[in-house]
């Protein structure tokens, strides 16, 4: 009897073992001869490596890359995820093999953005997507970096930022006069929203504050939900459970798109193709010209989606960069003084800084680069996916594989930066301190690269420079003695700092 029970137990154990082995083998893709799967850590059944990611996936995956290399694979739930680190490896994938890695995964959170019709977030990577991207890029350039013949400014962007920076200066000084301190984030957000609003719609959001500004100020729900590694995207059951953040995210998307639809409809009613004043008008004009063509017409809802993408390209990244910059300036007053000395020497105090001053302000440029690198406030690009079976660095990567691009790791790679956790803007200067080290500056990664590179990159860099130059020329920023600025990032699609309500600003000179 005992022998029979032992035999039965051994048979059962053997059966279970064989079943587990079969499941593991079935889980693994069949590899072409001579290739291997990317290495990676062992994961728990059903959970995969989700517990390893924790609250800071960029840090966890950077540590894993030190062990497994620049091409590694994890599982979140039952979904395999390729994680790419290292600048050369990422450039190989996104640039040299750009067509293979230009897709977007079909993730739940991304599908909620304009019903999977967003140029930036949707899985589409075909000819229609490419045409929409070109159209959006051209429209953005026309009303940002192109010159306005009727203005003394070098381009539309400079004109808008110069006006908004003056308004921001006034608001900050009013806050100082009233309460003696302020939280700069919402004030910066309003100014940046007004710049992109002027380019997209021809007006400032102050005219529609009841509709749009509270919505924009709640955009933190957006960047939290679409962050890389969100369990919501990999465990479908979570989509049906009570989730206040998810509901706020859905409400944000729905309300924001409805607001854009209203603005586009108003443009359509008043549209005159002989007098195009903004990006929305340019897209409507494109439709008027191509309405008789079979392949050029864009439905009105598609125009709303393009405007949504363009607005996003020029809003959140700029707001976050300027806000982080102010936090670092009050935490590093000596660096602030050095930048202001450079501004006084090159520009003086009789006129506003202009975009043409950039080459003569290397320390300002170095500071912005170091903000991009040190904060790495866009820790991952929006997730990519493979469009076909491919290989990378000798590893087999199947079609439709979800791919995380770890920009934080690139910006904190000790082999590249030596002391990656030190904040040193001067690292980007040449030996004589007069110019930017171009080779090193090109190793900073914040806007992605390749076919999915952010269409607003140039716009964002120019806008960040001009806002900061104007603010620092006129104001000295500080916090009261004893107030400690918390520079610990809060994880999301774009990482924010803890809000500080104790920032102060003192005029550096009087305006006559």
UniProtKB/Swiss-Prot annotation:
Entry annotated with the keyword Transferase: no
Protein name (record): Cytochrome P450 1A2
Subunit structure: Interacts with PGRMC1; the interaction requires PGRMC1 homodimerization.
Gene Ontology cellular-component annotations: endoplasmic reticulum membrane; intracellular membrane-bounded organelle
Molecular-function GO term, any one: iron ion binding
E.C. number(s) listed in UniProt: 1.14.14.1, 4.2.1.152
Source species: Canis lupus familiaris (Dog)
Induction: By polychlorinated biphenyl (PCB) in liver and kidney.
Gene this chain is encoded by: CYP1A2
């Amino acid at each position: 009897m005992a022998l029979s029970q032992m035999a039965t137990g051994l048979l059962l154990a053997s059966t279970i073992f064989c079943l587990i082995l079969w499941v593991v083998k079935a889980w693994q893709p069949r590899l072409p001869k001579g290739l291997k799967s990317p290495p990676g850590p062992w994961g728990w059944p059903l959970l995969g490596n989700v517990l390893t990611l924790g609250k800071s996936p960029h840090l966890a995956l950077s540590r894993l890359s030190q062990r497994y290399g620049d091409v590694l694979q994890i599982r979140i739930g039952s979904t395999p995820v390729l994680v790419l680190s290292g600048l050369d490896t990422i450039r190989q994938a996104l640039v040299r093999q750009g067509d293979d890695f230009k897709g977007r995964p079909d993730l739940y959170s991304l599908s909620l953005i304009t019903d999977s019709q967003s140029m930036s977030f949707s899985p589409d990577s075909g000819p229609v997507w490419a045409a929409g991207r070109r159209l959006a890029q051209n429209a953005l350039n026309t009303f940002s970096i192109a010159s306005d013949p009727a203005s003394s400014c070098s381009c539309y962007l400079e004109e808008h930022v110069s006006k908004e920076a003056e308004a921001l200066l006034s608001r900050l000084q009013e806050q100082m006069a009233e309460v003696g301190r302020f939280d700069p984030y919402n004030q910066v957000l309003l100014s940046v929203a007004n710049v992109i609003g002027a380019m997209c719609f021809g007006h400032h959001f102050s005219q529609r504050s009841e509709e749009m500004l509270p919505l924009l100020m709640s955009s933190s729900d957006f960047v939290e939900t679409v962050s890389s590694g969100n369990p919501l995207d990999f465990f479908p059951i979570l989509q049906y459970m009570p989730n206040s953040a998810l509901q706020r995210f859905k409400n944000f998307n729905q309300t924001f798109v409805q607001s854009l639809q209203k603005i586009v409809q108003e443009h359509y009613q008043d549209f005159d193709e002989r007098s195009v004043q903004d990006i929305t008008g340019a897209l409507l004009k494109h439709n008027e010209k191509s309405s008789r063509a079979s392949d050029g017409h864009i439905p009105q809802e598609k125009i709303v989606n393009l405007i949504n993408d363009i607005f996003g390209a020029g809003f959140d990244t700029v707001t976050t960069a300027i806000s982080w910059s102010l936090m670092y300036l009050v935490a590093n007053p000596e660096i602030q003084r050095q930048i202001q000395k450079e501004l006084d020497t090159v520009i003086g105090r009789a006129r506003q800084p202009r975009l043409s001053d950039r080459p003569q302000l290397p320390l300002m440029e170095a500071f912005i680069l170091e903000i991009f690198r040190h904060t790495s406030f866009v820790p991952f690009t929006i997730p990519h996916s493979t469009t076909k079976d491919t290989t990378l660095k000798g590893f087999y990567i199947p079609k439709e594989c979800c791919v995380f691009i770890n920009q934080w790791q690139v910006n904190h790679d000790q082999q590249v930066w030596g002391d990656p956790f030190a904040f040193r803007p001067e690292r980007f200067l040449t030996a004589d301190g007069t110019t930017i080290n171009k080779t090193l500056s090109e190793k900073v990664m914040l806007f992605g690269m390749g076919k999915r590179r952010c269409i607003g990159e140039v716009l964002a860099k120019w806008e960040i420079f001009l806002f900061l130059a104007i603010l620092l020329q006129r104001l000295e920023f500080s916090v009261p003695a004893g107030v400690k600025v918390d520079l610990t990032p809060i994880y999301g699609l774009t990482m924010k700092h803890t809000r500080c309500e104790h920032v102060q600003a003192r005029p550096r000179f009087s305006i006559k």
